[in-house]
Amino acid sequence: MGGWSSKPRKGMGTNLSVPNPLGFFPDHQLDPAFKANSENPDWDLNPHKDNWPDAHKVGVGAFGPGFTPPHGGLLGWSPQAQGILTSVPAAPPPASTNRQSGRQPTPLSPPLRDTHPQAVQWNSTTFHQTLQDPRVRALYLPAGGSSSGTVSPAQNTVSAISSILSTTGDPVPNMENIASGLLGPLLVLQAGFFSLTKILTIPQSLDSWWTSLNFLGGTPVCLGQNSQSQISSHSPTCCPPICPGYRWMCLRRFIIFLCILLLCLIFLLVLLDYQGMLPVCPLIPGSSTTSTGPCKTCTTPAQGTSMFPSCCCTKPTDGNCTCIPIPSSWAFAKYLWEWASVRFSWLSLLVPFVQWFVGLSPTVWLSVIWMMWFWGPSLYNILSPFMPLLPIFLCLWVYM
C-alpha cells in the first residue's frame, strides 16, 4: 500500500485481469471494465470511491441484511443496492410483561337493560306517544303547506299509524313459549301411542291365559297341527291363517275385546254415577210411576251450578204430589239396589255384609284380588262342570 502510481502493482489482488468488483482488499486494482485504465489505474485512490469503513455498516443490500459491499453491489449503484434504505419499518412494540399467556375467556356481556335502557323501554306504546308530540309530527309527518303551524292533515295519518301499531306492534312471541306449547301435545301423543301398544297386547295376554287353562302343568300347543294342514308346532295364541285353530283364536280375541269394552263402559257408568251425573229418581214405595204434569213444578234445581234436579216428584193415586230428594252420588246404584231388593227380598240380609266388606282396608282388597288371581285357574277347573247352571240361575233371577 503506497502512494498513487501510474504503474500497476504486483502481488496478490493487484492483477488487473482478474475481475473482483467487490473490493474485499484495500489495495485491489479493478478490471478496466470498472474504470480501471491508465489514466486512473488505482481505484482505491479515487476520491469518489466509498470509504472502506462503510463495508462494516449494517444494512439491507444486494447480498441480504447485514452486508453491504463498499463499492456497490452486483445490482448497480442504486441506493437499495448499496444498502441505503429510505424507509425502515418500525419494530413491533415489546410484549407486555404483566399479561397472562394463552387465550383469555371472553367476558360476559352486560344485560341489555343496563347497556341500552332505551331499547327496553321503546315499545309500541312509547312509539305511539312519541308520535303525538307536535315536534315529532312536524319532522316526520309534515302538515302539507299549513301556515298556522298546526298539523291537522297529520292527525288522520297518526291515527292510522296508531291503529296499525295497535294490531302489529305486539312483540314477537317467545320461542320458549312456543316450544313449551308444542311439548305438551307431543307428550300426550307419545303417552297415547304407548298406551295403545300396551292395550293391543292385552288381548294376546288374556288369550294366552285363556288357553293355558286347558294345559295346566304343560306347554300350550295348538291341536289343529295334526290335521290335514301339515304345519309346524306352534302356540294356540299364534295360529297362522292356514291353521284350523285360526278361527278359534279370532273368536277368542273377539270375545276378549267385547269383555274389555264392557268393563270400560261399566267403569264409565260407575264414574258418572259417583260424580252425580246420573240423576235417577229413587224408587218410591207405593208408586211405580213418575208424573210429568203438575208435579214437575215442585222439582227444584240442584245446589250450585249443576243443571240436574235435586228431587224427584211422583203423583200417587190420591192425587197428592210427593217429592223425594235425589242422592247427589250413587243415585243409579241405589236405584238398582232398591229394585233388586223389591224383586228379591233375601238380598236385604246381605246389607250388613256388604257394608262390612266396603269398609275393609285397601290391604284386604289387594289380598283378595291376589288370591283370586292365584287360585282363579284352579277354581275354574273345579267349577267348570257347574258352568251350564249359570244361565239357568240368571233366568230365574230375572223372571222371578
Swiss-Prot record:
Glycans are attached at residue 320. Residues 120-174 are annotated as: Pre-S2. Its main location: virion. The keyword Acetylation applies. GO terms for cellular component: membrane; viral envelope; virion membrane. Residues 2-119 are annotated as: Pre-S1. Residues 96-106 have a biased composition (Polar residues). Residues 2-181, 275-348, 399-400 are virion surface. Keywords: Acetylation, Caveolin-mediated endocytosis of virus by host, Fusion of virus membrane with host endosomal membrane, Fusion of virus membrane with host membrane, Glycoprotein, Host-virus interaction, Lipoprotein, Membrane, Myristate, Transmembrane, Transmembrane helix, Viral attachment to host cell, Viral envelope protein, Viral penetration into host cytoplasm, Virion, Virus endocytosis by host, Virus entry into host cell. Systematic vaccination of individuals at risk of exposure to the virus has been the main method of controlling the morbidity and mortality associated with hepatitis B. The first hepatitis B vaccine was manufactured by the purification and inactivation of HBsAg obtained from the plasma of chronic hepatitis B virus carriers. The vaccine is now produced by recombinant DNA techniques and expression of the S isoform in yeast cells. The pre-S region do not seem to induce strong enough antigenic response. A lipid is attached at residue 2 (N-myristoyl glycine). Residues 2-174 are annotated as: Pre-S. It is found in: Virion membrane. Belongs to the orthohepadnavirus major surface antigen family. The large envelope protein exists in two topological conformations, one which is termed 'external' or Le-HBsAg and the other 'internal' or Li-HBsAg. In its external conformation the protein attaches the virus to cell receptors and thereby initiating infection. This interaction determines the species specificity and liver tropism. This attachment induces virion internalization predominantly through caveolin-mediated endocytosis. The large envelope protein also assures fusion between virion membrane and endosomal membrane. Li-HBsAg interacts with capsid protein and with HDV Large delta antigen. Isoform M associates with host chaperone CANX through its pre-S2 N glycan. This association may be essential for M proper secretion. Interacts (via its myristoylated pre-S1 region) with the host SLC10A1/NTCP; this interaction is essential for viral entry. This is Large envelope protein. It comes from Hepatitis B virus genotype B1 (isolate Japan/Yamagata-2/1998).
